[in-house]
Each structure stands twice: as structure tokens, then as C-alpha cells.
């Protein structure tokens, strides 16, 4: 039975797992490892510590589907709409740039519900707090070491974490990446930003006419969303949640500052945008060191195969673009590359 490891429980990794399960007729052991405490990657949904039903999307806010991808990836959209994982965005987002024919979708149960859907479909064994440190070749298998626990062996590996994290891995993988591939990987770049989630008590009123707003006149804040309103799930029994995304220049400037300092600065600027906001009962500040790809890997559409037997490839938005369709494209390319090795 083939033993497959997918590193990264984000959009690309979870879809790779689901597609692999659907397209493999024989027995298959499928493991998904992630360094975080939950699935989602940059499509993460945080919960209030006081009420798990009070949630906030700290990564991707909504999904924009262009006419090109509406046709090309129709089966993926149809499936998620049929399961109720996605729903058309019906709430007003001020300052959103709309192009003709584009459709926007939200995830009523939180954006991470997309990832949870695919992981469930995959039947994979999903492990959190598993940070991969080394990948070595041992008797035609991959031996994978993590920060804690014993090394484990696999026949095939797909790496879907941000490219700089792939380049940090130790072991034989460092010599298996060719000089040309290394240059391509080192040229991949990302923007950085912070996201802040604010959770409120039930009954709290945040009286604004919009569900989300792009801010153009603030050095710190780029986007604000009343998250439950954006997802059209307002309830008198569950408090509202607010999501703030910082600008990229702010994210870069304060990248190595403490979360507490950053949170305080964002709060100060938020007072200028939404004066007199009530006090939240909980907050969650998320640093996105690798937020969105600004330069994807050149000349390797969708994935990069680092080794054939045993198979090792990397995929993710670093090889396409930082959106839902970019991740689908990468997952399909990974599957195409490994189908002869499974």
C-alpha cells in the first residue's frame, strides 16, 4: 500500500488529498501534516474562546470567480455550492473592484470549512503541530523528521507550504533540489500583513451600512469586515465578529514586532475608522508572514517535481497565484505529475 504524505493542511494540500483519494483505485495510506493547531492555512477561521459559534475569517475573506474559471473549475464550484459550503456573497462590500462577469462567494461556516470539506472527503489521517524539519532518502523511501517525535517513512511526498519554508528544510532534500530549481524557488516572493479578529458579546450592535469596506486613506488598515454580516449569518444569540486586515507596507514595517504592539497600533487606527466601537470580549491577532504571492515560481506551472522515484513534489500558490483558483490549478498539476507513481 502506497504511503503518501502531504505537508500543509491549507487549500492546495486538502484538495490534493481529496483528488488523490478520488482518483486512486487501490489501497492508499494518506497523511496530512500541518505545523498549525488546525486546518485552513491562509484560509483559516478563528473562534471566540467564549463561544465557538462566534467565528472570524482571518485569512481569505471571500472567493472571486472570473468567467474563465467559472467554466474551467465549474465542478469544484458546483460541488461546494451543492454542499452549502459556499454561498453567493449578498452583503455590501464598499470599495470592492468588480469586473464584468465576476461572481463572489462566501463560506457561511467560515472559510476554513472549504478545507475541512476536502480533508473529510480525502479520509486522510490529519496531524497538527507537526512541523517538518528534514527529508532524507532511505532505501527508496522518504524519511521525514519533525520537530518532535520519531521520523516516519513515506513513498510519496507533496509539499504545499509557502516556498520559503520548503527552502528551510534540512537533509537530503537540500542536495536533491537542482541549482536551477533553487534559483526558481528563491525568486518566489510574498507580501506580509496582519489580521486582527475581534469577538463581541451577543446583542452587541455595530451600526454600519456595510458588511465589509476597503480603506484607501489609512497607513495601517486596508480592509474591515463585520464578519458574521459578510457571511449573512447574523444571530441575536451569537455576538458579532470584526476582522481587520492591515496594509502590506504596515505588515512589512512591523513584521518582527510583538503581536501585542501590533494589536495596539491597529486598535488606535481603528478608532479613526470606526469611532466608539464597543470593547471586544476576545481578540486574535494573526501574523501572515507569507500572505499573498507577489512573484510566483517561473516556468513551472502549478508544481515543481524535485524527485521522481520516490516521488517528491511541491505545489501551492507559490507556483500559480494566491487565490482559490490558483490553489485548484496547483492541486490538479500535482495530481497530473504524480499519477504515474502511485
UniProtKB/Swiss-Prot annotation:
Superkingdom of origin: Eukaryota
InterPro entries from the UniProt entry: Amino_oxidase (IPR002937), FAD/NAD-bd_sf (IPR036188), RNLS (IPR040174)
Keyword Membrane among record annotations: no
Transmembrane region(s): none
Cofactor (UniProt): FAD
Sequence positions that bind FAD: 12, 42, 61-62
GO biological process: negative regulation of blood pressure; negative regulation of heart rate; response to catecholamine; response to epinephrine; response to ischemia; response to salt
GO terms under cellular component: extracellular region; extracellular space
Segment forming the signal sequence: 1-17
Primary enzyme class: oxidoreductase
Entry keyword Protease: no
Tissue expression summary: Secreted into the blood by the kidney. Highly expressed in the kidney, expressed at lower level in heart, skeletal muscle and small intestine. Its plasma concentration is markedly reduced in patients with end-stage renal disease, as compared with healthy subjects.
Protein location: Secreted
Pfam family, one: Amino_oxidase
Keywords, sorted A to Z: FAD, Flavoprotein, NAD, NADP, Oxidoreductase, Secreted, Signal
Catalyzed reaction equations: 1,2-dihydro-beta-NAD + O2 + H(+) = H2O2 + NAD(+); 1,2-dihydro-beta-NADP + O2 + H(+) = H2O2 + NADP(+); 1,6-dihydro-beta-NADP + O2 + H(+) = H2O2 + NADP(+); 1,6-dihydro-beta-NAD + O2 + H(+) = H2O2 + NAD(+)
Main location per the UniProt record: secreted
Purpose: Catalyzes the oxidation of the less abundant 1,2-dihydro-beta-NAD(P) and 1,6-dihydro-beta-NAD(P) to form beta-NAD(P)(+). The enzyme hormone is secreted by the kidney, and circulates in blood and modulates cardiac function and systemic blood pressure. Lowers blood pressure in vivo by decreasing cardiac contractility and heart rate and preventing a compensatory increase in peripheral vascular tone, suggesting a causal link to the increased plasma catecholamine and heightened cardiovascular risk.
Assigned protein family: Belongs to the renalase family.
Protein name as annotated: Renalase
Source organism per UniProt: Homo sapiens (Human)
Organism lineage string: Eukaryota, Metazoa, Chordata, Craniata, Vertebrata
Amino acid at each position: 500500500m502506497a504511503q503518501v504524505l502531504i505537508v500543509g493542511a491549507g487549500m492546495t494540500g486538502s484538495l490534493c488529498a481529496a483528488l488523490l483519494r478520488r482518483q486512486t483505485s487501490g489501497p492508499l495510506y494518506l497523511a496530512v501534516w500541518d505545523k498549525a493547531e488546525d486546518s485552513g492555512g491562509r484560509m483559516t477561521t478563528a473562534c471566540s474562546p467564549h463561544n465557538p459559534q462566534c467565528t472570524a475569517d482571518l485569512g481569505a475573506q471571500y472567493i472571486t470567480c472570473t468567467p474563465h474559471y467559472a467554466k474551467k473549475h465549474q465542478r469544484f464550484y458546483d460541488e461546494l455550492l451543492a454542499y452549502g459550503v459556499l454561498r453567493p456573497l449578498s452583503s455590501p462590500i464598499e470599495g470592492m473592484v468588480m469586473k464584468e462577469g465576476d461572481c463572489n462567494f462566501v463560506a457561511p461556516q467560515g472559510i476554513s470549512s472549504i478545507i475541512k470539506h476536502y480533508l473529510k472527503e480525502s479520509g486522510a489521517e490529519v496531524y497538527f503541530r507537526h512541523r517538518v524539519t528534514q527529508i532524507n532518502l532511505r532505501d527508496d523511501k522518504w524519511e521525514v523528521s519533525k520537530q518532535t517525535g520519531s521520523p516516519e517513512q513515506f513513498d510519496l511526498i507533496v509539499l504545499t507550504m509557502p516556498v520559503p519554508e520548503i527552502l528551510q528544510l534540512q537533509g537530503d532534500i537540500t542536495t536533491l533540489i537542482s541549482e536551477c530549481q533553487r534559483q526558481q524557488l528563491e525568486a518566489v516572493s510574498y507580501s506580509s500583513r496582519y489580521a486582527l479578529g475581534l469577538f463581541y458579546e451577543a446583542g452587541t450592535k455595530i451600526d454600519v451600512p456595510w458588511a465589509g469596506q476597503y480603506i484607501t486613506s489609512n497607513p495601517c488598515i486596508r480592509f474591515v469586515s463585520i464578519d458574521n454580516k459578510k457571511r449573512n449569518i447574523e444571530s441575536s444569540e451569537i455576538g458579532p465578529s470584526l476582522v481587520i486586515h492591515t496594509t502590506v507596507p504596515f505588515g512589512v514595517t512591523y513584521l518582527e514586532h510583538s503581536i501585542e504592539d501590533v494589536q495596539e497600533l491597529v486598535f488606535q487606527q481603528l478608532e479613526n475608522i470606526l469611532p466608539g466601537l464597543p470593547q471586544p470580549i476576545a481578540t486574535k491577532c494573526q501574523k501572515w508572514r507569507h500572505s499573498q504571492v507577489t512573484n510566483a515560481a517561473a516556468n513551472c506551472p502549478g508544481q515543481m517535481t524535485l524527485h521522481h522515484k520516490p516521488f517528491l513534489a511541491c505545489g501551492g500558490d507559490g507556483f500559480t497565484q494566491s487565490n482559490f483558483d490558483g490553489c485548484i490549478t496547483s492541486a490538479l498539476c500535482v495530481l497530473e505529475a504524480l499519477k504515474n507513481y502511485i
